[in-house]
């Protein structure tokens, strides 16, 4: 049973409740994407990780929940995309069964990879496996400069990531239309109150492409810019520096109402390794479950019993939702406007 955090209904520390800002409930649209968090196990422990994943984490998908998810993938043709994340999703139980079931059902499958997993014992075949099943690779690359990447993700991560990208290019990723390779930019966690919005996605993509091709011969399709939401390790760091509420206030001050129609929470379900369902991966990490109209927390078992994915009405919101609506907006697919 998920222990739900209490809803925030009144202004707190100068921050307007997100739902009050919208002046109307944030509602679900028909579900087209399942984002499945397979577990917390990861070979890295990045400072910006909202999942707080790492090598010592053991939580992962169970065979029972994996079977339920495969049934959902096969039963509902409205699902167009299955988005696999973690931790390092490749390290957690159920990764390959879910990939193969989803591809057999004709779904687009996204794997959110840290790239360095390719060089861990037992995972050396991953690049070829990705290509064989035509997985869309969304790879973490928080900067195109070595120093910044290694500061966020650990010494040597940049060089491993470069080798991994070159391997994917050799297999056709970034050039073959069936093998899409996208990179993800995360800004560094704020260290002072001199906050800034995520850089313009198109301009930064041009910078990434020019640098990586000129220096390493690497090509890729798209760059996604993602705002650091104040949850997980980012929240802990900001709170320790007394920057948590000032950062949330900054995000609210830059709220852009035109992002609302494109928010990823509207047409996706986020599912954890226990089979609990959330409106987004961020709510999952903050233990804010999706709720049926009667207040019951939604699970995968409920979906199978109901025979429908479209059982939710109102999306659960919290102050960190401003991270997805600030500036040009933010999502697992990058900027929104």
Predicted regions, residues:
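Radical SAM enzyme [4Fe-4S]-AdoMet core and its adjacent flexible, acidic
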Residues: 138, 145-265
């Amino acid at each position: 049973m998920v222990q739900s955090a209490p809803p925030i209904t009144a202004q707190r520390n100068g921050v307007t409740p997100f739902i009050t800002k919208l002046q109307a409930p944030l509602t679900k649209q028909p579900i087209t994407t399942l984002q499945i968090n397979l577990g917390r196990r990861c070979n890295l422990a990045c400072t910006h990780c909202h999942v707080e994943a790492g090598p010592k984490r053991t939580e992962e998908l169970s065979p029972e929940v994996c079977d339920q998810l495969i049934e959902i993938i096969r039963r509902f043709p409205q699902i167009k995309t299955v988005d696999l994340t973690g931790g390092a999703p490749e390290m957690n139980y159920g990764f390959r069964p879910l990939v193969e079931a989803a591809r057999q059902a004709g779904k687009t499958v996204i794997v959110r990879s840290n790239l360095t997993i390719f060089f861990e014992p037992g995972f050396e075949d991953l690049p070829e496996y990705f290509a064989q099943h035509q997985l869309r690779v969304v790879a973490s690359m928080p900067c195109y400069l070595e120093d910044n990447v290694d500061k966020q993700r650990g010494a040597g991560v940049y060089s491993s990531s470069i080798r991994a990208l070159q391997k994917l290019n050799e297999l056709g990723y970034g050039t073959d239309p069936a093998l899409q390779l996208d990179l993800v930019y995360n800004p560094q966690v704020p260290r002072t109150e001199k906050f800034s919005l995520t850089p313009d996605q198109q301009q930064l993509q041009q910078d990434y492409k020019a640098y990586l091709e000129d220096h390493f011969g690497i090509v890729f399709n798209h760059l996604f810019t993602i705002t650091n939401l104040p949850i997980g390790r980012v929240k802990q760091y900001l709170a320790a520096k007394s920057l948590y509420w000032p950062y949330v206030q900054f995000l609210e001050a830059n709220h852009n109402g035109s992002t609302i129609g494109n928010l990823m929470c509207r047409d996706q379900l986020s599912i954890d390794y226990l089979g609990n369902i959330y409106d987004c991966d961020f709510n999952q990490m903050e233990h804010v479950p999706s709720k049926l109209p009667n207040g019951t927390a939604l699970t995968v078992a409920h979906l199978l019993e109901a025979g429908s994915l479209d059982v939710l009405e109102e999306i659960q919101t919290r102050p960190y939702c401003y991270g997805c609506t600030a500036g040009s907006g933010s999502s697992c697919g990058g900027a929104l406007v």
